[in-house]
């Protein structure tokens, strides 16, 4: 099985233009060419399973395009995605932010999917994807070492 994990950073691109007109401005706009290049790159790898971190599921930033669905359709894969913040998080109310998610794309037959959430941290989402012979978990751990340690310990107890 070929598994690819890719933090696509909302297909916002990189480089000097990302920081114009102010630092970080690139997070407020997406570029369809970037998403197309990411999609072509993933196609070239011919993956069975793709974990996507930092995708946009249809905010104004992505031109209302669900990036997970668009990539999955291009690959001929099944997709499942969910907002990366807890269901009761204030982030669920904020435009653009409420469309920030993580996703799985899968070529093999999917037996089931579940969404779990850590009890602490900002990025709480855990996606569980059940395939025929294996269950795979997708987690975007915090940069905070204390939160990441707690989250990692939670994962190892499953």
Predicted regions located by residue number:
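N-terminal, active-site-proximal structural segment of metallo-dependent hydrolase catalytic domains
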Residues: 1-74, 81-89
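Short, basic/glycine-rich phosphate-binding loops at helix/coil junctions
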Residues: 11-21, 101-104, 133-137
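Short acidic/glycine-rich loop or secondary-structure boundary segments that cap or lie
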Residues: 13-14, 89, 113, 145-147
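Short secondary-structure boundary/capping elements
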Residues: 30-34, 121, 147
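A generic local structural motif
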Residues: 36-38, 91, 125, 153-155
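Structured beta-strand-rich core segments of catalytic domains in phosphoester-bond hydrolases
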Residues: 54-133
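Active-site beta-loop-alpha substructure in enzyme catalytic cores
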Residues: 134-158
């Amino acid at each position: 099985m070929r598994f690819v994990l890719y933090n696509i950073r909302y297909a916002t691109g990189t480089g000097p233009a990302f920081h114009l007109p102010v630092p970080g401005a690139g997070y407020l706009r997406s570029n369809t060419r970037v998403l197309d290049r990411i999609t072509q790159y993933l196609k070239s790898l011919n993956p069975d399973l793709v974990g996507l971190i930092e995708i946009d599921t249809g905010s104004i930033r992505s031109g209302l395009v669900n990036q997970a669905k668009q990539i999955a359709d291009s690959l001929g894969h099944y997709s499942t995605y969910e907002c990366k913040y807890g269901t009761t998080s204030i982030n669920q109310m904020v435009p653009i932010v409420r469309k920030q998610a993580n996703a799985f794309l899968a070529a093999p037959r999917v037996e089931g999917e579940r969404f779990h959430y850590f009890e602490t941290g900002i990025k709480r989402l855990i996606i569980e994807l059940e395939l025929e012979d294996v269950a795979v978990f997708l987690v975007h751990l915090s940069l905070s070492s204390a939160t990441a340690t707690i989250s990692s310990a939670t994962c190892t107890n499953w």
